[in-house]
Amino acid sequence: MKKPIIGITLDEEKSKTYSKYPWYAARKNYSESIDLAGGTSIFLPHSSENINQYLNLIDGLVITGGDFDINPEIYGKEISSKFVKLKKERTFFEFEITKKAVDMNLPLLGICGGQQLLNVVLGGTLIQHIPDKIQSNINHEQENPRDQPSHVVKIKKSSNLYKITKSEEMFVNSAHHQSVDNLGKGLKVNSFTEDGVIEGIENPNQKFCIGVQWHPEFLIDDKDLEIFKALVESSRKN
């Protein structure tokens, strides 16, 4: 049986830790999670002119996270936090491919910053720095390693995420200082933390359109793999 091909977006760096020239990067556990879920993956360079070819090639899409933020101007706001860091080229590419993927009803999973991007693509806004808006005992930028849990998320029983995980709670990691604020068109909250931060979103009218604020590719909770399995299975039917 042919395995579904899942496209995974890359991060880009200009630091000289690897090369003195700009380079792409992605953690292995993104593709390893797709492999474990029964799919195969390819990484997508930030070539906007090739977006249509990418979308004709792949059966599903993962928008990954990274140590950067979406320019608030894209969702009609000014920068209000000194902690906002931008990557213009990556954001432009991911915005365009996500918009087209949604229009095509292509199965899509947004992870961390990928969830935030999905929300912005659909007209939503973001909290630019959580501590500026929400007082909380939860450290959403955990100090312990990312392969360890940080906190619990509550999952709504009415959501597709609940149908996938069959659970009302998950232990997750946490590596973000921004979060979804106003929801984009067609999106619903599927999970949240006790302090009210939105941890997951979805469009129930799409074949598979889910965003999570944590990094399920670390497979901390056994239900993380179920998310990737659901993406791959939806992509198999694409």
Segments predicted by a language model, with ranges:
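Post-Walker A helix-loop "phosphate-sensing" segment adjacent to the P-loop in P-loop NTPases
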Residues: 123-127
